[in-house]
From Swiss-Prot:
GO cellular component: extracellular space
Organ and tissue specificity: Expressed by the venom gland.
Protein name: Beta-theraphotoxin-Cm1a
GO biological process, alphabetically ordered: envenomation resulting in negative regulation of voltage-gated sodium channel activity in another organism
């Protein structure tokens, strides 16, 4: 199961969905342009 938009995440263990990335600053999944 992956994390979607605006879900809180850990930058060291990025479990965001495909095309998303865990923001180190905000600590939630953002769309990776």
């Amino acid at each position: 199961d992956c994390l979607g938009w605006f879900k809180s995440c850990d930058p060291k263990n990025d479990k965001c969905c495909k095309n998303y990335t865990c923001s180190r600053r905000d600590r939630w999944c953002k769309y990776d342009l």
